[in-house]
Amino acid sequence: MTWSKPAYTDLRIGFEVTMYFASR
């Protein structure tokens, strides 16, 4: 799901990082 909203993009990046650390 690729959204064109900058705010959502930033939020998604933060979520990706959170999931990344959660997976470790």
UniProtKB/Swiss-Prot annotation:
Entry-linked InterPro entries: PQQ_synth_PqqA
Cross-link Pyrroloquinoline quinone (Glu-Tyr) placement: 16-20
Domain of life: Bacteria
Entry keyword Ribonucleoprotein: no
Signal peptide: none
Coiled coil residues, start to end: none
Record-level GO BP terms: pyrroloquinoline quinone biosynthetic process
KW NADP (keyword) present: no
A Pfam family: PqqA
Pathway linked to the protein: Cofactor biosynthesis; pyrroloquinoline quinone biosynthesis
Keyword terms of this UniProt record: PQQ biosynthesis
Database matches in NCBIfam families: PQQ_syn_pqqA (TIGR02107)
Family, as annotated: Belongs to the PqqA family.
Functional description taken from the UniProt entry: Required for coenzyme pyrroloquinoline quinone (PQQ) biosynthesis. PQQ is probably formed by cross-linking a specific glutamate to a specific tyrosine residue and excising these residues from the peptide.
UniProt-recorded name of the protein: Coenzyme PQQ synthesis protein A
Organism: Pseudomonas fluorescens (strain SBW25)
